[in-house]
Amino acid sequence: LLPVLVLSILIYKILHKNWRHSHWEVDIIAEKTGTLHFVEVKTRRTKKFGHPEENVNKKKIQNLINAADEYLYQQPQWKKIQFNILSITILKNKPIEYFFIEDVYL
């Protein structure tokens, strides 16, 4: 729910949450100003293992691309797309931190 709230504040229209096809998944598919956004969300409750966005590895990126390809096959009307990462850190007794990386080059 928190990722949807963050994106809503940033004026994104949420189209799908946890969209799946076969074994691929996109955490959030959203639209903003005519562009379709595929958003990978990473959340952590500790900084022990680094920042959440650092856990978006090559395999995850490839799965996101494959899922996006399938989505676009099913919804061919979209001409402009973008990949984003939403990183959320929730630490005890601290304000929630989020870091939104737009237009990630894959």
Model-found features: residue ranges?
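Domain-level recognition of nuclease-like catalytic cores that cleave nucleotide substrates
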Residues: 73-106
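Mid-chain, well-packed structural core segment of small domains
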Residues: 48-79
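Short acidic/glycine-enriched loop/turn segments that link adjacent beta-strands
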Residues: 21-24, 94
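Conserved catalytic cores of phosphodiester-cleaving nucleases, focusing on short active-site segments
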Residues: 26-47, 56, 64
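Acidic-basic catalytic patches of nuclease active cores, encompassing PD-(D/E)XK
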Residues: 1-17
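Short, solvent-exposed loop/turn elements at beta->coil junctions and helix N-caps
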Residues: 16-20, 86-89
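Protein kinase-like catalytic core scaffold
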Residues: 24, 35-37, 84, 99
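Hydrophobic "anchor" residues on beta-strands that sit immediately upstream
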Residues: 13, 36, 80
